């Protein structure tokens, strides 16, 4: 079963990279909460090593705004690398997917 989940993770990684190149997104806890509160977020991605309290707050705001949440398998270092950034990314919200079909695949 591990190869299937690994392939699925690579598929999500490539779709996320395409979204970063062609769509609109916000990085970081404060901007993700702001996009959830205003209703602009279409998808929230949370890294695996995000603190529990922060994760539960994001889940709460996502539940209020009826926004889907995806739990990234890797830590915030890996999520930052997938996004093409040289820093850690704990949370990100996708405002517009651009050319990617990540919203329908998750």
UniProtKB/Swiss-Prot annotation:
GO cellular component, one term: cytosolic large ribosomal subunit
InterPro entries per record: Ribosomal_eL30-like, Ribosomal_eL30-like_sf, Ribosomal_eL30_CS, Ribosomal_eL8/eL30/eS12/Gad45
Compartments, record wording: Cytoplasm
Gene Ontology biological process terms, A to Z: negative regulation of mRNA splicing, via spliceosome; rRNA processing
Protein name listed in UniProt: Large ribosomal subunit protein eL30
Keywords: Cytoplasm, Ribonucleoprotein, Ribosomal protein
Residue ranges of the TM segments: none
Signal peptide: none
Record GO terms (molecular function): pre-mRNA 5'-splice site binding; RNA binding; structural constituent of ribosome
Quaternary state and interactors: Component of the large ribosomal subunit. Mature ribosomes consist of a small (40S) and a large (60S) subunit. The 40S subunit contains about 32 different proteins and 1 molecule of RNA (18S). The 60S subunit contains 45 different proteins and 3 molecules of RNA (25S, 5.8S and 5S).
Family from the record: Belongs to the eukaryotic ribosomal protein eL30 family.
Role according to the record: Component of the ribosome, a large ribonucleoprotein complex responsible for the synthesis of proteins in the cell. The small ribosomal subunit (SSU) binds messenger RNAs (mRNAs) and translates the encoded message by selecting cognate aminoacyl-transfer RNA (tRNA) molecules. The large subunit (LSU) contains the ribosomal catalytic site termed the peptidyl transferase center (PTC), which catalyzes the formation of peptide bonds, thereby polymerizing the amino acids delivered by tRNAs into a polypeptide chain.
């Amino acid at each position: 079963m591990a190869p299937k989940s690994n392939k699925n993770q690579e598929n999500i990684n490539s779709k996320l990279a395409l979204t970063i190149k062609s769509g609109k997104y916000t990085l970081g806890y404060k901007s993700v909460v702001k996009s959830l509160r205003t209703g602009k977020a279409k998808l929230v991605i949370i890294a695996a090593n995000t603190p529990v309290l922060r994760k539960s707050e994001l889940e709460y705001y996502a539940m209020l705004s009826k926004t889907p949440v995806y739990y990234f398998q890797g830590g915030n270092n890996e999520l930052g690398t997938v996004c093409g950034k040289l820093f850690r990314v704990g949370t990100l919200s996708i405002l517009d997917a651009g050319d990617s079909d990540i919203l329908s695949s998750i």
